[in-house]
Amino acid sequence: LIIDSFPVPVCQPIRNYRAKVFRGYANIGYKATKKIYFYGFKVHAIVSDDGYILDYVVTKASVHDARETVELMENTHPSNYYLLGDEGYLGKELHQQLKQMGYELWTPYRKNMTGAKKHNDHQLMAIRRTIESDFSLLTYYNAENNRARSLIGFQSRLEIAILAYNLAYCLERFN
């Protein structure tokens, strides 16, 4: 299983502090890949090794990735006992919580950590590309560009995007 999150901005970065939509529900988070702050939500998802989205949780944008991991694993009940995450899931406390639940979390080391070159296996990093390609396909279904103005609209548009992705996945897989 692979775990990661992607941002769902509600407005352009210039409007982060003036936005009135979802006030009280959304807040400002940081998108490290583009090095920008955004106002909105973050979707945390667990994906199977071959790319099927098993479960997801929507949080405020400022919520750290590791916070939702235990809840996602409790909801999913996977038969696979290995979980692959990125550097955002580093931490002894999270590793211990998941180990108590019977799961093994594998995260690559940061470049400045000792033993990073030996630990960061290119084959496992290639498996992580699965979830990154899934998230880019979700962009095709407008999961990241959710223009809803109500919570019900936001939830339904996100669920439709994930459903459309999973249906396309099944059609491609079984044909």
Where are these regions (language model features)?
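Polybasic low-complexity intrinsically disordered regions
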Residues: 1-87, 92-101, 110
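Short, solvent-exposed polar/charged micro-motifs at secondary-structure junctions
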Residues: 9-15, 116-118, 159
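Structural motif
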Residues: 33-36, 149-158
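Short alpha-helical "patches" and their helix-cap loops
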Residues: 57-60, 151-153, 174-175
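Catalytic-loop motifs flanking and including active-site residues across diverse enzymes
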Residues: 68, 130, 159-162
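Helix-centered, glycine/charged polyanion-binding patches within enzymatic domains
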Residues: 81-82, 87-152
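Charged phosphate-binding loop/patch that engages nucleotide di/tri-phosphates or the phosphate backbone
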Residues: 159-175
